[in-house]
Structure formats: C-alpha cells, structure tokens
From Swiss-Prot:
This is Snaclec anticoagulant protein subunit B. InterPro entries: C-type_lectin-like (IPR001304), C-type_lectin-like/link_sf (IPR016186), C-type_lectin/snaclec_domain (IPR050111), C-type_lectin_CS (IPR018378), CTDL_fold (IPR016187). Gene3D superfamilies: Mannose-Binding Protein A, subunit A. The keyword Coiled coil does not apply. Belongs to the snaclec family. PROSITE patterns: C_TYPE_LECTIN_1 (PS00615), C_TYPE_LECTIN_2 (PS50041). The lineage of its organism: Eukaryota, Metazoa, Chordata, Craniata, Vertebrata. Heterodimer with subunit A of agkisacutacin or AaACP; disulfide-linked. Expressed by the venom gland. Its main location: secreted.
C-alpha cells in the first residue's frame, strides 16, 4: 500500500509539472518559449491581418521574431497550415516613420510618398524577409505572450 501511494504521488507531481509547459496557450495554439502562435490560412492585407490577430486573444499581434530558433519554429508551424508561399509578420513602417531623416539632420515633417507604407512578409522559397505594399493579400501568423 505504501508503494502504491508513493508511485501515485510521484505520478501526480510529474503530471502537475508537465501540465504547465503548454497549458498557458489555448488548445488550438502552439507554444514556444513562453509565447503562443497560431497560423491562419485566411489571406488578408497587413492591417486587416493585424486587426484580426488583436481580436483572437488579449495581447495578440502579427508574429515577431526574436531569434533564428523562434523563426524556424514558426515557419514549420505555418507551413503545416498553409502551403509554402508567404505570410505576414508584424514588422512595418506604418506606425513609425522616424527612421527617415534628411541629410542635413532636419526632422521629417513633410512627406509626399508615391507608395503606401511598406510591410514585411516571410518568403518560403529562400526563408528571407521581404517588404512590399501593405495592401498585398497574404496568410499570417498571430502571436501573444503566454
């Protein structure tokens, strides 16, 4: 009887310790390094995809990459959901144009751009990031911190 209790207690401790590893993400999301990810095979332009992500879960946005390992995880996950191609990431020039500066160091106050702001997508044929008009339609991956 003592051995049964010991083994049962050991299994309970093991179960409780393992249950916290992926329990922070909803069941239809995937977990990696404290973040939850979900690819969507619902092509949208960048702004609509970002808006869609914010409605899926508190704190959710289009995916951002902090390491090669994270990018590899997300790419594999994404292409299990949709075929190879492209998908939106959360990187864009929409929100912050302070990267632009005149050569005389004057701040950029007036603009007359010919094109819309650019957004970044991941291209599977060479695993590189590319920028294009934010109006393009693409699949996307949402992410939030668990």
């Amino acid at each position: 009887m003592g051995r049964f209790i010991f083994v049962s207690f050991g299994l309970l401790v093991l179960f409780l310790s393992l249950s916290g590893t992926a329990a922070d993400c909803p069941s239809d999301w995937s977990s990696y390094e404290g973040h939850c990810y979900k690819p969507f095979n619902e092509p949208k332009n960048w702004a609509d995809a970002e808006n869609f992500c914010t409605q899926q879960h508190t704190g959710s946005h289009l995916v951002s990459f902090q390491s090669t390992e994270e990018a590899d995880f997300v790419v594999k996950l994404a292409f299990q959901t949709f075929d190879y191609g492209i998908f939106w990431m959360g990187l864009s020039k929409i929100w912050n144009q302070c990267n632009w500066q005149w050569s005389n160091a004057a701040m950029l106050k007036y603009t007359d751009w010919a094109e819309e702001s650019y957004c970044v997508y991941f291209k599977s044929t060479n695993n590189k990031w590319r920028s294009i008009t934010c109006r393009m339609i693409a699949n996307f991956v949402c992410e939030f911190q668990a």
